[in-house]
Amino acid sequence: MKVLGIDPGSRYCGYAIVEKINNKNQLIEAGLIKIKPNDLQYQITELCEGLDLIFKNHQFDEVAIEDIFFAYNPKTVLKLAQFRGALSLKILQMHGEFAEYTPLQVKKTVTGKAKATKEQVAFMVKRLLGISKDIKPLDITDAIAVALTHSANLRVKK
């Protein structure tokens, strides 16, 4: 079972492909779609082109994305919502349905604490996957955590 986990953002979109083999999760690939500062329409185009490459180079059984977090700046919320809409449409076109998780759900699943820090999430991601070296930036570990959360929820549903 291969899961694509996505952590959307306005500068970087983290992605991770995790495969469950014999009840053990393995990291297949993880990285970033870098979104250059530009007009919003060009940023959305960069995001969609980055997703196109991921979908063309890999096949997945499931896709999961992290819901946008609450931000105090209304402009940031609007921008993230527009990225999220474009991301959702692209996933629906390329794959079909997808799962969504709040940051609190992801943190709770991976660390056991809904209020865990990004560093605690990164530590547990490495531990759960048996990875010794640091994974940077944290957008990538967040995407891995989303994939692990969905993988765990699939196990519970079956």
UniProtKB/Swiss-Prot annotation:
Similarity comment: family membership: Belongs to the RuvC family.
Alphabetized Gene3D superfamilies for the sequence: Ribonuclease H-like superfamily/Ribonuclease H
Co-factor requirement: Mg(2+)
Function, in words: The RuvA-RuvB-RuvC complex processes Holliday junction (HJ) DNA during genetic recombination and DNA repair. Endonuclease that resolves HJ intermediates. Cleaves cruciform DNA by making single-stranded nicks across the HJ at symmetrical positions within the homologous arms, yielding a 5'-phosphate and a 3'-hydroxyl group; requires a central core of homology in the junction. The consensus cleavage sequence is 5'-(A/T)TT(C/G)-3'. Cleavage occurs on the 3'-side of the TT dinucleotide at the point of strand exchange.
Main location: cytoplasm
Name the UniProt record assigns to this protein: Crossover junction endodeoxyribonuclease RuvC
Annotated residues for binding of Mg(2+) 2: E66
PROSITE patterns: RUVC
Compartment(s) where it occurs, according to its Swiss-Prot or TrEMBL record: Cytoplasm
HAMAP family: RuvC
Organism: Campylobacter lari (strain RM2100 / D67 / ATCC BAA-1060)
Source superkingdom: Bacteria
